[in-house]
Structure formats: structure tokens, C-alpha cells
Amino acid sequence: MKKLIAMVTVLALAFSVFANRGKDAGGINWPKKSINLIVPFAAGGNSDVNARTLAKYLTQELRQPVVVTNVAGSGGTIGAAQVKDSANDGYTVLVHQISMHMAQVSGMVNFGYQDFEPVCVFSRASDEVLLINAKQHPDWHTYQDVVNATKNEPGKYRFTANTGASTQWIGIAVQAAGAKFNVVSSGGSGERLQLILGNHVDVTELNYSQVIDYVKNGTLRIIANVSTERSDILKDVPTLKELGVNCGYSYDNTFFMPKGTDKAIVAKFAAACEKIIKTNAQYKADLEKLYQVPMYKNPAETTALYKSQYDALMAIRDQIRAGVKK
């Protein structure tokens, strides 16, 4: 009888070990297959570069492939909607930033950060800057030069903005501050770069890391910093706020999962990101080469950040929807 009891006990323990094989301390057996990071913008932009840089380290940390898929269009809303409507099993993750709010506040879509599970902020982009093509406009050296030109010939000069994204906010703000641009719609940062290089637009906003080579060789010229304060990298470039434009922000690249995703999965993915961001020296070096800033905010901190951004934009919702601040 004792032998029988002992055998049953051993079998029970063996079954328990087998049943829980692959589960972590949180009691979840995840991930069991590849994870798809959806970047709702074209390849080569800020969100894409940051996601791809972290993805290779997440693949090592989570021991499953972490791949990036670009689903561009409509200011990031197509890719965001795809993730929102995906299964909440932890295998589809959205990469987004402050421009998520613009689509919702402007009325382009009826969903926003509230319809996802915020996972974590994983990096901050280098300075966002306003640029001109120096070869196209050799006499424009400052932001005020550009504004004066638009006032002299209202509607002639084109400012490109991604409708429903953060660049639309800039377009509204510079017009409200007195500029007389023809604000035209465009795609994400990759498309805007090609437009300004090809002389198809006169002013655009891009991440400094995307344009540093063009700035150094004299093709593009920076006329303003979109960040809330001057940076160490661009000490001599004034911010829009300094120039009298009521606009300033940073791109905090963020992961979101579909609403209802198991909190344990959210926590495990966030913890993997935190470990890489805070302890992996090679990851930090990779980001710094791209002029990006490693940053981590946990799910609660990320939710609080996005609420504050959303509330700030909702305060000027009518102005955003009208297209011009009154």
C-alpha cells in the first residue's frame, strides 16, 4: 500500500511538472510563438527604427521571434485599428506615441489609448525639428524668415502635416501664431522626408536622427525645435514655444496590447523591456548611435502619461477640429 501511495505521489509530481513546464513565476505559459509588433507608419521612421532596435533584444529575452510589421496609413489609425481588433492573447502589439491622441481628438477615429492595455514607454525619440530645404530656399535662415515669406505670399508655401497625427497639431499652432502656410496632408516621417528632399513641400517636421546627414551636408536646414525645451544636441536651435508658437512635445515610443489582454502577459512583456532598457549596455549604445534616448515607464506610469497628454489636447479639441486655433 505504501509503495502504491509513493508511486501515485511521484506520478502526481511528474504530471505537475509537465503541466507547468514553460510557465514562469507569474503562472503563464507565454509566449509560445512569435510576437508581432505593429508599427502604424512606414519603414524608416522614428517608431519603426525604435521598434526594430528593441525587437532583436526582446527576441533574445523572450526566446521567441519578435518581428516588426509596418501597417501605414491615415496618420497611424489603420495599424492602430488592426491591433485594437486583434485577439487579446499577447501576440499582437502596437507601437505608438503622442500622435495617437490627435486622431481621436480630431475626430478621425472614435478610439484611443483607453481602448488598449498600455504596456510601457520604451524610448524617447531625439528632438523633433522643423526643416526647410536649404537649396530650395537659400535666403531662409530662421523660423521668422519663413513666417515673413508666408505673410508676404499667403498660401504659396506648403507645410506638410500627417492628418490625425502630431504634425497636424504643429500645423494648427504655427498658423495660429501668424504664419500663412498652405497646410497639406502627407503620410508618416519617411514620406515627409522624401517630400522635403524632392522640393515638393517647403517646411516639414522630422526627427533629428532621420535628417542629421542632410543637415550636415547643407541640404536641409533646421529652423526650430518642436521639443518643450532646448536640447544638448541642438543648443542653438530655439523651440517653437520660444518663437511664440503654443506647441511642444516629445515622442515617447510606447507599446500597447489589445484591451483585455491578461495582466500577467502585459507585466511579463513590460518586465522584459525594463530589463533590456535598464541593464543591456549594447542596446543603449545602439540607441545612442541613432540619437534616441532609452526610457522606461511601467504600465501605470504609461497610462498616467497618456491621460495627461490626452487631457491637454482635449482642452483645445474645438480648435483642432476646426483646423485653426481661434
Name what the model sees in each region:
Residues 1-4:
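Positively charged n-region of N-terminal signal peptides that target proteins for export
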Residues 21-117, 166, 178-203, 286, ...:
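N-terminal (or domain-start) structured segment
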Residues 32-34, 176, 181, 263-326:
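An extracytoplasmic/periplasmic, membrane-proximal ligand-sensing/linker region
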Residues 80, 144-147, 193, 212:
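Short hydrophobic/charged patches on amphipathic alpha-helices used for structural packing
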Residues 85-90, 106-191, 252-286:
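Hinge/capping helix and adjacent helix->loop/strand transition within the periplasmic-binding protein
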Residues 126, 211-280, 285, 308-311, ...:
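C-terminal lobe and pocket-closing loops
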Residues 155-237:
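Ligand-binding pocket segment of bilobal, Venus flytrap-like solute-binding proteins
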